[in-house]
Amino acid sequence: MFLRYFLDENQQRVYTLKRTAPSGEQTLTAHPARFSPEDKNSKYRIIIKKRFGLLPTQKAKTVC
């Protein structure tokens, strides 16, 4: 069993062990992907993220 979550109406995470939320949608995994220092594809992922503006440094700053 893996910990999973879904977003409620207030966009807050609700953690569960089920694969579907009460609304019927799929839940998301609460665990990050595994990391390997020998990752051969990280260079290409960074290139793609730069191209599409997905790096954290490329996001607009939000004012709270």
UniProtKB/Swiss-Prot annotation:
Alphabetical keyword list: Nucleus, Ribonucleoprotein, Ribosome biogenesis, rRNA processing
GO terms for cellular component: box H/ACA snoRNP complex
Location within or outside the cell: Nucleus, Nucleolus
A single GO molecular function term of this UniProt record: snoRNA binding
SUPFAM superfamilies listed in its UniProt record: Nop10-like SnoRNP (SSF144210)
InterPro entries listed in its UniProt record: H/ACA_rnp_Nop10, H/ACA_rnp_Nop10_sf
GO BP terms, alphabetized: rRNA pseudouridine synthesis; snRNA pseudouridine synthesis
Family that this chain belongs to: Belongs to the NOP10 family.
Subunit-level organization: Component of the small nucleolar ribonucleoprotein particles containing H/ACA-type snoRNAs (H/ACA snoRNPs).
Function: Required for ribosome biogenesis. Part of a complex which catalyzes pseudouridylation of rRNA. This involves the isomerization of uridine such that the ribose is subsequently attached to C5, instead of the normal N1. Pseudouridine ('psi') residues may serve to stabilize the conformation of rRNAs.
Protein name: Putative H/ACA ribonucleoprotein complex subunit 3
Provenance organism: Caenorhabditis elegans
Gene from which this protein is expressed: nola-3
